[in-house]
Amino acid sequence: CSLAEAEADTFAGDIGFLSHKDPVSILTFTKVPKGLSGGVTLLGIAGSAVGAMLISTLFIGTYYLSLPVFALIASSGVIGALLDSLLGASVQVHYRDSSGCLTEHRYDSEGRENERARGIPFIDNDMVNMISGLFSGTIGAVFAYIIS
């Protein structure tokens, strides 16, 4: 389930970046720059589902042929990816670079420290990914226990 979340998050970002529509904040639904954590597009959410289903298909094809297991892995992956976006928009640290744009990078390309704009300082993108993966794995385990 955690692998499905990681793939769903990757597909959401990579496929969502191709969207012709501007991403919106998952919290406020206001436009945000492409690539900024917490931004979503319909194409990105669809990509998230494709990524989670890909991992789910590989799992059931290799280990266990079952539609409920497929649905469990895929849904926990998508839920985890949506949580990733929620955390990215709410608690993940964001900085403001010298041009005034929001970024996830603490330092600019010349090594100067960017000003913190929002978020909790120690919750960077890696921490958000870890929390989302743990959550997705836990949700998957709980759902597996319920359906078994």
Residue ranges of predicted features:
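Hydrophobic alpha-helical transmembrane segments
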Residues: 1-148
